[in-house]
């Protein structure tokens, strides 16, 4: 069965053309899916014949709430979703004065091996499809009744280890016929996968890149974050600089301020010791 919600509007138009339908139907189907339709039977402006064709060849992803916890302190809601294959992921909805931010997962599990992260214990099970990332935003908004204005890819998984599906998700959630959440309202957090950062820079998107350091020196970082053994922090700073040059968007991080100064001072000391200008 085809995962129709992971299709772009253009792909959907071509798919419907192959089914013998006019391509303008794609916009109708796309709109229904991005409003949270769980069944083709809900798509009342489609013919019964077309709905039957789609039901016979396509599936609509939709997660089920396993657990929902809401903080009485600040209204934060934590969701545990069950996907259609039985795997589970987490999503968190946070309230701020500037709007509602949803933190979504990009994979089932993670293979990055960071010592402080529980989601990597069982390793990476599989990547999430674009539709499954979109569903977290869409169904969190529908279930909570709160309009989502910002997205953070900082949940389970390393987004740049699933870069193609993440890129497609970004296009879907940003689409004017969908949820239309602006790129400047989206942040992507990475532990430092440099090829992924460079790939992202080539897309010239206006999202914010958030880099997790978690250590004030490269030796400590390598001990708690295996990714640093492959892509050390000096290379990471250089990749972030190239990202800024390509996009004009700074790279940030929840833990970057405290560690970054120490790391930069260390880099400067090493340069001075080597006699570099």
Locate each region found by the language model.
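Residues at alpha-helix caps and immediate loop-helix transition turns in enzyme cores, especially N-
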Residues: 129, 162-166, 259
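A short loop-to-beta-strand scaffold at the N-terminal edge of the catalytic core in hydrolase folds
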Residues: 88-93
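Auxiliary Fe-S-binding modules of radical SAM enzymes
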Residues: 1-87, 238-277
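Conserved alpha-helical substructure of the radical SAM core
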Residues: 121-150
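Feature marks short, surface-exposed loop/turn motifs that line or immediately flank catalytic pockets
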Residues: 33, 97, 215-219
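Canonical Radical SAM [4Fe-4S] cluster-binding loop centered on the CxxxCxxC motif
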Residues: 95-132
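Conserved AdoMet/S-adenosylmethionine-binding subsite of the radical SAM
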Residues: 139-150, 155-253
């Amino acid at each position: 069965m085809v995962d129709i919600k992971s299709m772009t509007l253009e792909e959907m138009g071509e798919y419907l053309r192959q089914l013998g339908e006019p391509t303008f139907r794609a916009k109708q189907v796309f709109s229904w899916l991005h409003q949270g339709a769980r069944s083709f039977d809900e798509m009342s402006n489609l013919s019964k014949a077309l709905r039957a064709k789609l039901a016979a060849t396509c599936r609509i992803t939709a997660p089920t709430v396993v657990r929902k916890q809401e903080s009485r302190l600040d209204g934060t809601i934590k969701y545990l979703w069950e996907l259609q294959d039985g795997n589970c992921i987490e999503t968190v909805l946070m309230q701020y004065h500037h709007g509602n931010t949803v933190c979504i997962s990009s994979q089932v599990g993670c293979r990055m091996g960071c010592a402080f992260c529980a989601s990597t214990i069982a390793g990476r099970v599989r990547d999430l499809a674009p539709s499954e990332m979109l569903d977290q935003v869409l169904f969190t908004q529908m279930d909570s009744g709160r309009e989502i204005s910002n997205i953070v890819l900082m949940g389970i998984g390393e987004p740049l280890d699933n870069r193609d599906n993440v890129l497609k998700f970004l296009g879907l959630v940003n689409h004017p016929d969908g949820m239309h959440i602006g790129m400047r309202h989206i942040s992507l957090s990475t532990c430092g996968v440099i090829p992924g950062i460079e790939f992202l820079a080539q897309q010239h998107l206006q999202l914010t890149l958030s880099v997790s350091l978690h250590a004030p020196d490269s030796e400590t970082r390598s001990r708690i974050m295996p990714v640093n053994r492959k892509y050390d922090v000096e290379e990471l700073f250089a990749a972030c600089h190239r990202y800024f040059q390509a996009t004009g968007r700074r790279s940030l991080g929840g833990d970057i301020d405290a560690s970054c100064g120490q790391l930069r001072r260390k880099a400067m000391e090493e340069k001075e010791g080597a006699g570099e200008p």
